[in-house]
């Protein structure tokens, strides 16, 4: 293993989980936090549940980020509405690669206009969970079949840093996939998750929404509409839908509409 310095910018559920996993794998792991979360981390450290035990991660906790504090990879794990503030804060830092683990359809050019061309590596996390009232992380990676950590160069080309990032994830036992068009992948991802989220919020009993036929039918109709719309546009511009998730979506959804 090549020793890498990693900064996690954002200490919510996603950032905290990746920080814990990178630290377990032996990487020089640092996490940047603010406000109450920073105070909690400084007082108690980053604690997380694993196999019914509470473990304290071996990481460095930061409340500020000097420009000359350089990392091999900076993982940006903030909410979308915090993205531009974070990019502005990172623009003068000398680290070369910022992995934007954010669900956003904004133009990557806008991000590069802030931090500089060639620094952005778009990505999407594969994890979920919560932080309880005691500040203890209870989270897990999503299975590879459902949602691996996904990333790509903006150009779609392979690069030395995508190879290095793959190795980091592999060594930390984090499922991942490299795609050729991250923006297209996120479009497809939203086409799927928005109808599912709508079903959750429309139900009076979200935990058993799968038993509500009317909502499930509406969800299937929305999914089919989204995929057909995406497919028609992508066909028009000569692109290809990501194969791992979207092969022949209309046929499978037709079964749910009968």
Where are these regions (language model features)?
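Residues at the starts of beta-strands that form the adenosine-phosphate
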Residues: 5, 28-30, 97, 119, ...
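Conserved beta-strand termini and adjacent loop/short-helix elements that scaffold enzyme active sites
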Residues: 32-34, 51, 62-64, 123-125, ...
């Amino acid at each position: 293993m090549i020793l890498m310095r990693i900064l996690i910018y954002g200490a919510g559920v996603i950032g905290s989980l990746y920080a814990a996993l990178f630290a377990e794998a032996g990487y020089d792991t640092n996490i940047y936090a603010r406000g109450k979360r920073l105070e909690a981390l400084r007082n108690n450290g980053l604690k997380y549940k694993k196999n019914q035990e509470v473990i304290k991660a071996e990481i460095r906790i930061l409340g500020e980020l000097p420009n000359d504090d350089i990392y091999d990879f900076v993982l940006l794990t903030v909410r979308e509405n915090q993205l531009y503030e974070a990019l502005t804060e990172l623009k003068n830092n000398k680290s070369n690669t910022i992995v934007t683990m954010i669900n956003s359809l904004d133009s990557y050019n806008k991000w590069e206009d802030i931090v500089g061309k060639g620094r952005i590596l778009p990505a999407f996390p594969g994890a979920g969970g919560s932080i309880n009232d005691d500040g203890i992380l209870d989270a897990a990676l999503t299975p590879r079949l459902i949602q691996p950590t996904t990333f790509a160069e903006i150009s779609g080309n392979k690069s030395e840093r995508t190879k290095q990032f793959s190795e980091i994830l592999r060594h930390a036992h984090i499922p991942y996939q490299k795609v050729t068009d991250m923006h297209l992948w996120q479009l497809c991802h939203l086409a799927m998750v928005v109808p599912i989220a709508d079903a959750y919020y429309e139900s009076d009993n979200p935990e058993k929404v799968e038993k509500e036929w009317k909502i499930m039918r509406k969800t299937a109709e929305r999914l089919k509409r989204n995929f057909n719309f995406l497919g028609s546009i992508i066909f028009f511009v000569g692109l290809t839908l990501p194969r791992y998730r979207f092969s022949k979506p209309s046929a499978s959804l037709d079964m749910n509409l009968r």
